[in-house]
């Protein structure tokens, strides 16, 4: 395990909302919600910290957000402007290193082991980047500093907003032991529910399990979690990373025969895929359905649409059509997955912030 790398994860604080509050003084100090008209079927893209105090969060239906925060200010947002500001932030990063791996408009990994300024302390690099972003752009960022990407990302969320958390190799396991497993990068709702059923709530709980037992219960997730909680993750910062597909799949606790359960899973997946596509500023043209039967036979079916989309309803309709064509209801299903491929950058004027 290489512990000599110096990795920073920068995560902008409530990015879209903060840009709007910076540019529009009338929004400052008020609950601002970006996601469109609450009277329509939309989702929250992000919201200000003032709105979060009411329980509003990203991916929440705007109607629900309006009930939680009746005095909230709802706007559609300006994606082209957010991209412009994101590029300004990226330019600040590039003053320190060219090894930058963007995850979305508002977050990125930086490898500053050998940085352009010759600074020995990654902590000082992170602080300087935070200060520069604030001084030049009037925005705050949180930072996590560690020797691998997994820990750096968790650390960046530890002291939001405008915080910095440093985790050394010596501190890594103790730090991870206190973290709820729901905060582990890559642990989604389904995996979290499985972990909770196993009595695993924190990193400390996770460490009590053997590698074999975790793999038996969680398959590939178990393999990765066993290593992550011990600080064993050597994924490099990849400046050339480009997502070729966006998808979601789940293994059922019990084999499923009911097509309605399968369709419900596809609807949930479509919403999650839409959310990720919007964050990546991409849309796709090919929908792929994956089914694994109880005997472990696996099939994949795909449908190429007439136009590119990041719309959950269109993605779901295509996946549901593939399901009806593929599944007879005679054999039970162990796993179902939905993926959108054939991706390309979305034109800003067409980018959907409203969701469903």
Curated annotation (Swiss-Prot):
Enzyme class of the recorded protein, top EC level: transferase
Reactions performed catalytically: DNA(n) + a 2'-deoxyribonucleoside 5'-triphosphate = DNA(n+1) + diphosphate
Record keywords: Cytoplasm, DNA damage, DNA repair, DNA replication, DNA-binding, DNA-directed DNA polymerase, Magnesium, Metal-binding, Mutator protein, Nucleotidyltransferase, Transferase
Cofactor: Mg(2+)
Recorded GO MF terms: damaged DNA binding; DNA-directed DNA polymerase activity; magnesium ion binding
Pfam families listed in its UniProt record: IMS, IMS_C, IMS_HHH
Localization terms from the record: Cytoplasm
Limits of the UmuC domain: 7-188
Active site per database record: 107
An annotated GO BP: DNA-templated DNA replication
Domain of life: Bacteria
Gene3D superfamilies registered for this protein in UniProt: 3.30.70.270, 3.40.1170.60, 5' to 3' exonuclease, C-terminal subdomain (1.10.150.20), DNA polymerase, Y-family, little finger domain (3.30.1490.100)
Residues carrying the site annotation Substrate discrimination: 16
GO cellular component, one term: cytosol
EC identifiers of the protein: 2.7.7.7
InterPro entries, A to Z: DNA/RNA_pol_sf, DNA_pol_Y-fam_lit_finger_sf, DNA_pol_Y-fam_little_finger, DNA_polymerase-Y, DNApol_IV, PolY_HhH_motif, Rev_trsase/Diguanyl_cyclase, UmuC
Keyword check for Cell wall biogenesis/degradation: no
Main location: cytoplasm
Family named by the database record: Belongs to the DNA polymerase type-Y family.
Quaternary structure (record): Monomer.
Protein name as annotated: DNA polymerase IV
């Amino acid at each position: 395990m290489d512990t000599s790398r110096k990795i920073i994860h920068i995560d902008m604080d409530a990015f879209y909302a903060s840009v709007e509050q910076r540019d529009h003084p009338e929004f400052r100090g008020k609950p601002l919600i970006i996601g469109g008209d609450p009277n329509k079927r939309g989702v929250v893209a992000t919201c200000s910290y003032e709105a979060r105090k009411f329980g509003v969060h990203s991916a929440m239906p705007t109607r629900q957000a309006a009930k939680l925060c009746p005095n909230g200010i709802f706007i559609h947002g300006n994606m082209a402007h957010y991209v412009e500001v994101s590029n300004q932030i990226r330019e600040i990063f590039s003053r320190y290193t060219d090894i930058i791996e963007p995850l979305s408009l508002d977050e990125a990994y930086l490898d500053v082991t050998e940085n352009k300024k010759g600074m020995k302390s990654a902590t000082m690099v992170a602080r300087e980047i935070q200060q520069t972003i604030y001084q030049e752009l009037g925005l705050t960022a949180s930072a996590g500093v560690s020797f691998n990407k997994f820990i750096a990302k968790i650390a960046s969320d530890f002291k939001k907003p405008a915080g910095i958390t440093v985790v050394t190799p010596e501190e890594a396991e103790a730090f991870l032991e206190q973290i709820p497993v729901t905060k582990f990068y890559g642990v989604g709702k389904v995996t979290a529910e499985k972990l909770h059923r196993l009595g695993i709530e924190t990193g400390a709980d996770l460490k009590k399990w053997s590698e074999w037992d975790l793999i038996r219960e969680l398959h590939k997730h178990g393999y990765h979690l066993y290593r992550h909680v011990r600080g064993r993750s050597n994924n490099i910062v990849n400046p050339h990373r480009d997502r070729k597909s966006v998808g979601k799949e789940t293994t059922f606790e019990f084999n499923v025969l009911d097509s309605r359960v399968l369709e419900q899973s596809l609807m949930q997946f479509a919403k999650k895929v839409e959310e990720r596509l919007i964050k990546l500023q991409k849309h796709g043209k090919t929908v792929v359905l994956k089914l694994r039967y109880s005997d472990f036979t696996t099939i994949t079916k795909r449908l190429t649409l007439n136009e590119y989309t990041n719309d959950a309803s269109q993605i779901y309709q295509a996946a549901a059509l593939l399901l009806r064509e593929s599944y007879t209801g005679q054999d039970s299903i162990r796993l179902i997955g939905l993926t959108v491929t054939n991706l390309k950058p979305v034109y800003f004027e067409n980018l959907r912030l409203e969701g469903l």
